[in-house]
From Swiss-Prot:
Gene that this sequence comes from: allA
Span of the signal peptide: none
Protein name, per record: Ureidoglycolate lyase
Tagged with keyword DNA-binding: no
NCBIfam families xref list: PRK03606.1-2, PRK13395.1
Annotated GO biological process: allantoin catabolic process; purine nucleobase catabolic process
UniProt source species: Pseudomonas syringae pv. syringae (strain B728a)
Length: 170
């Protein structure tokens, strides 16, 4: 099993997979008579069909036991999916490039600083939300519409990956 190296989440490193949603270094302008700073268009919601709708949900995630064997990734071929942490806690992100199936060798892991969210572009393979805390809440923006928008791929035994965030502690 290949151990995934957990990288800091940066816009540059994550660009092949989607957008990092954060205020640091982002364009902004003042609104509401100068009382509010708007960080505008941090990510685009992608949908496949004109009749699709962008929806907002909250996911309450439970921590999985670590180290974690990564045996499955999913993708959303009909729309993007964004996760923004609501409680300010760091969380883990596991992604692989767009393709017919995810390539185990191309899979990468990132850690958010708790003030960063991510927007997975259409078709990007990713692990379901991975909280480090016992329980965490995420604002989720994704697509609602006709058609199956979730494909799952299970890795063969020889392609399994392991994720161990414990080096992040301390």
């Amino acid at each position: 099993m290949r151990k995934l190296i957990i990288e800091p989440l940066t816009k540059e490193a994550f660009a092949p997979f989607g957008d990092v949603i954060e205020t640091d270094g982002s364009d902004h302008f003042m609104i509401n008579n100068g009382s509010t700073m708007r960080f505008h268009r941090l990510a685009d919601v992608q949908t496949a069909q004109p009749e699709d709708k962008a929806i907002i949900s909250i996911f309450r995630a439970e921590a999985l036991p670590m180290p974690l064997t990564i045996g499955m990734l999913e993708r959303h071929p009909l729309g993007s999916q964004a996760f923004v942490p609501l409680l300010g806690n760091p969380f883990l992100i596991v992604v692989a490039p767009v393709g017919d199936v995810p390539e185990s060798e191309a899979t990468r892991a990132f850690v958010s600083n708790g003030r960063q969210g991510v927007n997975y572009h259409r078709g990007v393979w990713h692990h379901p939300v991975l909280t480090i805390e016992k329980r965490d809440d995420f604002l989720v923006v994704d697509r609602s519409g006709e058609g199956n928008n979730c494909d799952e791929h299970y890795f063969a035994e020889s392609q399994l990956l392991v994720l161990d965030p414990h080096p992040l502690e301390g």
